[in-house]
């Protein structure tokens, strides 16, 4: 399964580990993905989303129905 947030679309990004001697080696910054179940009152069912902690805060702020509506408008299947 891809390490991609279903709500925000955040993906792993690349960068460097930098030592004290300023040597650089490649590394990946992974998104803080969480798997959560949400109750959709309008459809009377549970949905499971794989989202980042930032997206979880968006769900808390805007509500799951609004977030799911935005996802469906983008063409994502929920």
Swiss-Prot record:
InterPro entries: Ribosomal_bL28, Ribosomal_bL28/bL31-like_sf, Ribosomal_bL28_bact-type, Ribosomal_bL28_sf
Family statement: Belongs to the bacterial ribosomal protein bL28 family.
The protein's name: Large ribosomal subunit protein bL28
Annotated SUPFAM superfamilies: L28p-like
Record's keyword annotation contains Protease: no
Species of provenance: Nitrosomonas europaea (strain ATCC 19718 / CIP 103999 / KCTC 2705 / NBRC 14298)
Transmembrane intervals: none
Annotated region described as Disordered, given as residue ranges: 1-26
UniProt signal peptide: none
Gene3D superfamilies: Ribosomal protein L28/L24
Superkingdom of origin: Bacteria
Keywords: Ribonucleoprotein, Ribosomal protein
Cellular component GO terms held in the UniProt record: cytosolic large ribosomal subunit
An example molecular function term from Gene Ontology annotations: structural constituent of ribosome
GO biological process: one example: translation
């Amino acid at each position: 399964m891809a390490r991609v947030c279903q709500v925000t679309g955040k993906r792993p990004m690349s960068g460097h580990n930098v030592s004290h001697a300023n040597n650089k080696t490649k590394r990946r910054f992974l998104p803080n993905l969480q798997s959560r179940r949400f109750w959709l009152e309008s459809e009377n069912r549970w949905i499971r989303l794989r989202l980042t902690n930032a997206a979880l805060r968006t769900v808390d702020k805007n509500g799951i129905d609004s977030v799911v509506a935005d996802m469906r408008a983008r063409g994502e299947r929920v």
